[in-house]
Amino acid sequence: MAFHMATRYAHSPEDIKHFDTTKLRQEFLMEKIFNAGDILLTYTYNDRMIFGGVVPTESSLEIKLSKELGVDFFLQCRELGVINIGGPGSIIVDGDKAAMVKQDGYYIGMGTKQVVFASDNPANPAKFYVVSTPAHKTYPNKKLPFANALAKPMGDQQHLNKRTIYKYIDASQMATCQLQMGYTVLEPGSSWNTMPAHTHARRMETYMYFDFAEPDTRVLHLLGESTETRHIALFNEQAVVNPSWSIHCGVGTTNYAFIWAMCGENQTYDDMDQVPMNELR
């Protein structure tokens, strides 16, 4: 088992005006999220979110972080969200085991001492996408089946953005310290997500793109200020960090899905500032 946690530092809008393609990818793109038998995480200084992939195969896996966070155990001062995008598996949370099929989610509150991830079949392993944010209070652990996610249809075929937003961890459904997490699926024939674009100065956000309709599908993710945009080309199962001051949207060569996760000082989902289309550059 390999464990690796990369670090991404925070940048101002002025910084990325001077980034070339290589530098932009180094600072905002996570190219490898899932690797069989491994835990691959990224710590971003944007609101101190930790995110990444856990892929257990023959053996179960546990995230063990202490000195790196200045604590005795990983979730001593953090909460955790999980969504499985792979084969069937399970999570054991302080001794309580829950089955996790594809698209199932789980919220795990501050103070939980042990979270163990396992796959039912090593040949078809679970792929647990995990997101952790700082916490100040303990909220109950809760399994979040896909069937119970709050579905919100958005967009239309004319604008190539027909999609469904599935809210797993959302202030309208459950209490958390600051974590919000969900899953957006674009319909065949649609390619744009989050367009028209917006920003939310009180929350940062990560996007993890996956379930590409074709092997050669690519997504061009847009970030930066609305008048100074940049793009990053993403492959399947890659993630990008979006600072709170940045737009965050993308267009694919075919349809796809992505997991979004947010944290910051405001949990109101609709607390955002729309960007007029004529402002984009």
Swiss-Prot record:
> Which parts of the sequence bind Zn(2+)?
H198, H200, E205, H248
Which N-terminal stretch is annotated as signal sequence? none
Enumerate the UniProt keywords alphabetically: Isomerase, Metal-binding, Zinc
Short name of one Pfam family = KduI
Q: Which domain of life is it from?
A: Bacteria
Q: Which CDD domains match?
A: cupin_KduI_C (cd20491), cupin_KduI_N (cd20294)
User: What is the free-text note on the cofactor?
Assistant: Binds 1 zinc ion per subunit.
The EC number of this protein is 5.3.1.17
Q: Which Gene3D superfamilies match?
A: Jelly Rolls, pectin degrading enzyme 5-keto 4- deoxyuronate isomerase, domain 1
Q: Which GO terms describe its biological process?
A: D-galacturonate catabolic process; D-glucuronate catabolic process; pectin catabolic process
Which GO molecular function entries does the Swiss-Prot or TrEMBL record give? 4-deoxy-L-threo-5-hexosulose-uronate ketol-isomerase activity; zinc ion binding
Family note: Belongs to the KduI family.
Q: What does this protein do?
A: Catalyzes the isomerization of 5-dehydro-4-deoxy-D-glucuronate to 3-deoxy-D-glycero-2,5-hexodiulosonate.
**Name by which UniProt lists this protein:** 4-deoxy-L-threo-5-hexosulose-uronate ketol-isomerase
Lineage, please? Bacteria, Bacillati, Bacillota, Bacilli, Lactobacillales
